[in-house]
A protein has these predicted regions:
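Alpha-helical repeat scaffolds
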Residues: 82-85, 117-133, 164-178, 216-232, ...
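Generic helix N-cap/helix-start motif at coil->alpha-helix transitions
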Residues: 58-64, 139-140, 187-188, 206, ...
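Residue-level detector of the short coil/turn that links helix A to helix B
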Residues: 75, 161, 258-259, 293, ...
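Alpha-helical adaptor scaffolds
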Residues: 247-256, 290-291, 405-415, 431-474
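Alpha-helical segment of the N-proximal tetratricopeptide repeat
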Residues: 63-77, 284, 402-419
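Solenoid-like repeat scaffolds
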Residues: 56-58, 86-92, 136, 183, ...
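Residue-level recognition of tetratricopeptide repeat
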Residues: 69, 103, 110, 148, ...
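Short coil/linker segments at helix-helix boundaries
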Residues: 57-63, 71, 75-83, 101-270
């Protein structure tokens, strides 16, 4: 069809040119004017040639673009950019390379948070959206690329503390994806992106539902996870291409929202995810390992990752291994935590890392360095996370944690349950003087019993913690209610699970309230099969 239109226009332009020149020869005698007319006519035909008229923008995810995407998703950004540069030269009207460059911006800004890089790249958002608008609306990529771009910039803006505009970016992404789902229901990548956003929207607290509904954002954890699973279980070219990205979303949501943590690590093992060469999977496995009390596993993953040139240089590797080593009270933990603080240019994590560094020195009886790390907490800018608020609060208090409880906490966080229990063995709440220490003791004991699968003993200690601390500002009582909810949920006692999830939500004005409320709300949604 395209070749037919080109031939028709070629004949038309040939006729115009011949007729125009024939008529002009009748009236123009000057050889100079004649040459000028010939030149203008020739230029006219070149400028309005069929090739120019039909040089419209396209979305062509060809083999070369697929190769670039695969390199980028492994965090081999330089290799991906080189392939993109070649594609741009060979196919200047293909919009997919510009779309893929947004992934490069995203990974650089999301993981490293360098303000100078942000300043350099922030205008790319508007430029790329305008470029995508030049593509054919008949392609499912017309809306899909814009949705991905807005989604990635929403995450970036959260990292840079611009939560208001991040919310608007998420809304734009959500609505584009929703519209694309309606226009192209068989376009499989919709399930990956829209499914992920459905889950995220499904965790919005009830108090904000009116606002999300007003903005057109309505989600469902159940529906969103079903969409993601449908995508991963399908058998088509798009699943093959977007497989790794979809897995990243799926496992994080399964871990944090569905609370199916064991299934996450079973998936990583059974699917044989390349946690060595794919640095996105390296980060996923190590980060979730640390947050699932598997510090030994995280250290193993990080120590075996491919360190060859070409990967994105990320200070967060030092943070992750520093956390994992601290959770086993290893003497070299401070090396990694200090290196992170020195090299990381962003705000996220910094106060939390400095708090952990202060704990390390405090447990080493190096009070001078412990105090210096605390002082830095108060000097650093805040990204506004709950962990940072807690670190700031502790630093301002001037009070240091009880060393027995701190060691037990770190060892339990690392998955070294027997060692943690041994620290507290033979002690009771009466051995601690301060009310907050008595409260923390019962909570720590409950968590250790819980993690050792001694559920009845855990529930007993959790209930004591709730009774002692439900009106205090520490997070121990609210977290205890959440954990009791988890225990009953696993027993399939959904009615009691909902009672304790709601009890967690009902507790006011305590540390980590937003994140604990979100987890409790997700628990209620699961129990209601929502």
């Amino acid at each position: 069809m395209i070749s037919y239109y080109r031939r028709s226009h070629e004949r038309l332009f040939y006729f115009i040119r011949v007729s125009y020149l024939a008529n002009m020869k009748k009236y123009i005698c000057s050889s100079t004017l004649q040459r000028l007319v010939y030149a203008l006519s020739f230029s006219f035909c070149l400028f309005f040639s069929p090739g120019k008229i039909f040089a419209q923008k396209v979305f062509d995810f060809n083999a070369q673009c697929q190769k670039a995407y695969q390199q980028i998703i492994m965090l081999k950004l330089d290799d991906g950019q080189k392939i993109i540069d070649v594609e741009k030269q060979q196919h200047p009207n293909n919009l997919i390379p510009c779309y893929l460059e947004n992934y490069i911006d995203f990974f650089i800004l999301f993981f490293n948070e360098d303000p100078a890089e942000f300043k350099t790249r922030e205008d790319n958002l508007e430029k790329r959206i305008k470029l995508m608008d030049k593509g054919p609306e008949s392609s499912p990529f017309f809306l899909f690329t814009k949705s991905i771009i807005h989604f990635q910039w929403a995450a970036v803006k959260i990292k840079f503390g611009d939560n208001w505009n991040a919310g608007w970016e998420f809304r734009r992404s959500f609505l584009f994806s929703k519209e694309n789902q309606k226009k192209f229901p068989s376009f499989a990548p919709n399930d990956m992106l829209y499914g992920s956003m459905q889950v995220a929207a499904g965790t919005i607290p009830d108090g904000y539902k009116w606002l999300s509904n007003l903005l057109g954002i309505k989600g469902s954890i159940k529906t969103g996870m079903q969409q993601l699973e449908r995508f991963l279980n399908a058998n088509n070219e798009w699943v093959s291409l977007y497989h790794d990205e979809a897995i990243f979303y799926y496992l994080y949501l399964k871990f944090y929202i569905e609370n199916k943590k064991n299934e996450v690590f079973k998936f990583i093992t059974e699917k044989n995810l390349d946690v060595k060469n794919n640095h996105l999977f390296t980060y996923l496995a190590a980060n979730l390992g640390i947050n699932n009390q598997q510090s030994s596993y995280a250290i193993n993953v990080l120590s075996q990752k491919n360190n060859s040139a070409g990967y994105l240089n990320m200070p967060v590797w030092d943070m992750e291994i520093g956390y994992a080593k601290l959770n086993h009270l290893e003497p070299d933990a401070a090396i990694y935590l200090n290196r992170f603080v020195q090299n990381f240019k962003g705000k996220f994590y910094v106060k939390d890392v400095l708090q952990k560094l202060s704990w390390f020195y405090y447990l080493q009886d190096d009070q001078k360095r412990a105090d210096a790390a605390r002082k830095l907490i108060l000097q650093k800018e805040s990204a506004g996370t709950e962990a940072e608020k807690q670190a700031q609060k502790e630093a301002l208090s001037g009070v240091w944690p009880n060393k027995f409880l701190l060691k037990a906490r770190l060892l339990n966080d690392g998955g070294y349950y027997a060692e943690a229990l041994q620290i507290l063995q033979g002690k009771t709440s009466a051995d601690f003087l301060l009310p907050q220490e008595k409260l923390e003791f019962t909570y720590r004991l409950a968590r250790i019993y819980d993690d050792m699968n001694r559920k009845d003993e855990a529930i007993a200690e959790y209930l004591i913690t709730i009774k002692m601390g439900e009106h205090r500002k520490e997070y121990f009582a609210a977290r205890s209610a959440l954990q009791v909810g988890y225990i009953y949920e696993k027993k399939n006692d959904k009615a009691d699970a909902i009672v304790y999830f709601q009890k967690c939500i009902d507790m006011k004005d305590h540390e980590y309230k937003n994140s604990l409320d979100q987890k409790a709300k997700a628990g209620i949604a699961r129990c209601n099969n929502d």
